[in-house]
Amino acid sequence: MIPGELVIDDGEHTLNAGRHTIALVVANTGDRPVQVGSHYHFHEVNDALSFDRAAARGFRLNIAAGTAVRFEPGQTRTVELVELGGARAVYGFQGKVMGPL
């Protein structure tokens, strides 16, 4: 293998297959753009984003790893979220959970 080389199977690949997803309407009520990364606990994103935070607890954006979604000031859009995997514990971010979900 060459450093940085990607070895990928042939065919189609489905991200997060079999995981529970939800759709939420999100509005940027602030005066600055807000960018949210692929693995950020959506419940704890910037407070300028207005949406059902309780519904987003334990979820992240359902997008490819290493990518992000940008919300421009005044913009409203629907996003798809996917449940967090692994041990289902959240530490850090804004410190709103700091333990098991």
UniProtKB/Swiss-Prot annotation:
Biological process (GO) annotations held by this record are: urea catabolic process
Q: What is its main location?
A: cytoplasm
Enzyme class, broadest EC rank: hydrolase
Reactions that this protein is recorded to catalyse: urea + 2 H2O + H(+) = hydrogencarbonate + 2 NH4(+)
Q: Name one GO cellular component term.
A: urease complex
Give the UniProt keywords, A-Z: Cytoplasm, Hydrolase
Matching entries from InterPro entries are given as: Urease_beta-like, Urease_betasu_sf, Urease_subunit
Which cell locations does it reside in? Cytoplasm
So, what pathway does this thing act in?
A: Nitrogen metabolism; urea degradation; CO(2) and NH(3) from urea (urease route): step 1/1
Q: What is its EC number?
A: 3.5.1.5
User: Could you give a GO molecular-function term held by this entry?
Assistant: urease activity
- Annotated NCBIfam families: PRK13203.1 (NF009682), urease_beta (TIGR00192)
What PANTHER family does the database record attribute to this sequence? UREASE (PTHR33569:SF1)
What protein family is recorded? Belongs to the urease beta subunit family.
Subunit info here reads: Heterotrimer of UreA (gamma), UreB (beta) and UreC (alpha) subunits. Three heterotrimers associate to form the active enzyme.
Query: What is this protein's record name?
Result: Urease subunit beta
The gene from which this protein is expressed is: ureB
